[in-house]
Curated annotation (Swiss-Prot):
Chain positions covered by the region annotation Disordered: 1-101, 126-165
UniProt biased composition (Acidic residues): 154-165
Residue ranges the UniProt entry marks as DNA-binding: 68-134
GO cellular component: nucleus
Name used for this protein in its record: Probable WRKY transcription factor 65
Compartment list: Nucleus
Record function comment: Transcription factor. Interacts specifically with the W box (5'-(T)TGAC[CT]-3'), a frequently occurring elicitor-responsive cis-acting element.
InterPro entries recorded: WRKY_dom, WRKY_dom_sf, WRKY_plant
Broad class of the protein's primary localization: nucleus
Keywords: DNA-binding, Nucleus, Transcription, Transcription regulation
Amino acid composition bias (Basic and acidic residues), ranges on this chain: 1-17, 47-69
Pfam family, one: WRKY
Amino acid sequence: MKRGLDMARSYNDHESSQETGPESPNSSTFNGMKALISSHSPKRSRRSVEKRVVNVPMKEMEGSRHKGDTTPPSDSWAWRKYGQKPIKGSPYPRGYYRCSSTKGCPARKQVERSRDDPTMILITYTSEHNHPWPLTSSTRNGPKPKPEPKPEPEPEVEPEAEEEDNKFMVLGRGIETTPSCVDEFAWFTEMETTSSTILESPIFSSEKKTAVSGADDVAVFFPMGEEDESLFADLGELPECSVVFRHRSSVVGSQVEIF
């Protein structure tokens, strides 16, 4: 009996040794290649991506549709919002933005309000931009040159004096050509002829012949008839401005001039 049991055990040990024998060369080569690939392959996980957190004072968004939604502060990049979701333990949602300055840029950021200080905004940047820094509006437009001041036009001097002279000239011409004025001053033109006749009359010629001293005054009396007195009886005294007046009598036929 004992001999049979020993033979059975030895048989089982032989089979187990064959099963657990040395590995074949094919299996060892396969395991080595698998370990090499696993050592050189990068770990693609979200935790390996570098993140940068920035605290910025909050700016309330005017006309916000969602309660607690905030507008991220400007950082010279163009961003486009593509999602939003609530956060556990916080009354404020989290917004997700991607860079829209250049197509295909991997830069992302998350914007949310701080739980501890609601007046602050937490901005988490992930990835980096693959394009140069965008130009600001001031550098893009450039300083505009100031417009040069336009010279003020000099005021034109109106020829007022010449116009007034022309007015007086026109008025003078009108007076000369008016027939009523011609009749009114006709006596002044006849004064030369009458004065010349008076000087040539025999009365004044006889006075030259008589010798009179320089100190004595010479008085000339002209005879005046009754008819002449009756003609001038109804007339009043002439004003002082009258220098010359003239009287003609058809009966006597004499002409008297008084200066």
